[in-house]
Amino acid sequence: MDFFSSQKITNHITRIYLPGDVQAYLVEGMDKSVLIDTGCGIGDLKAYVATLTGKPITVLLTHGHLDHAPGAVQFDTVYMNLADRGIYAAHDLIQQRIDYVETTSFAGKYRREDLLPENSADAFLDLQDGMRFDLGGLHITAYACPGHTPGSMAFLIEEDRMLLLGDSCNPFTFLFDITSLGVSSYE
C-alpha cells in the first residue's frame, strides 16, 4: 500500500504527506538532510525518504505527540526536546496510535502489521533552543516554542527564510490538552 506522497515546496524542502492527515518535511542541503517529524509510525517512512534523497538523515521532532513522532523508531539520529519524553512515552503506544488514526481520513486503510513497534525515547538526543544544524550550504536553527507541549520546537531554515512550527501555530493548535501549557505560555 502507498502510505506516502510528497510535494516539492522549495529547492530545498519537500513536504511529505503521512497517514493520519499530518505532514513531515525533508530539508536537503548539499551534504546532509533533515527530516522534520515522522508521523504516526505507519508504513516504511525510511524507505520512502530514501527515494527522495541519498544523503544522511537527521530527524528533528517538533514535539512528542503520536501524530508527529512514533515514526522516528526507524532512524538512527533523532533529536527531540526531552521535556516531551513523558508525552512521547504515553503517545507511542500502538493502541493510542490506532485510536487516533481511526479518526482521520486514513481510517481503515492500513493493517495492524503496518504499525511500527513501540519505542523508548531513551536513544533520542536532546534538542535545545538555539541548536544549529549545518546541512552544507543550508542551515536550520531550532527554537523552543513551548505551549502545545512543554518541549515544542520550531525550525528556521535560514537560507529559505522559512519557519516550520509543527503544531505550535495552526488553525487547530491544542492548548487545552493535559500536556499543554495553555495560552499564558504564548504571552
Residue positions per predicted region:
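Short coil/loop residues immediately preceding or within conserved phosphate-binding loops
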Residues: 22, 122, 130, 137-140
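Short Gly/Pro-enriched turn/cap motifs at secondary-structure boundaries
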Residues: 16-17, 116, 122-124, 144-146
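Metallo-beta-lactamase
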Residues: 33, 40-41, 132, 139-187
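Conserved beta-strand hairpin/beta-sheet module of binuclear metal-dependent hydrolase folds
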Residues: 2-51, 154-170
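Short, hydrophobic/aromatic-rich segments at coil-to-beta transitions
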Residues: 9-15, 130, 139-141
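Active-site HxH/HxHxD metal-binding segment of metal-dependent hydrolases
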Residues: 42-132
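Residues at the C-termini of beta-strands that transition into short coil/loop
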Residues: 17-19, 63, 82, 146
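Short, conserved active-site loop motifs that form the nucleotide-linked donor/cofactor pocket
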Residues: 13, 57, 124, 140, ...
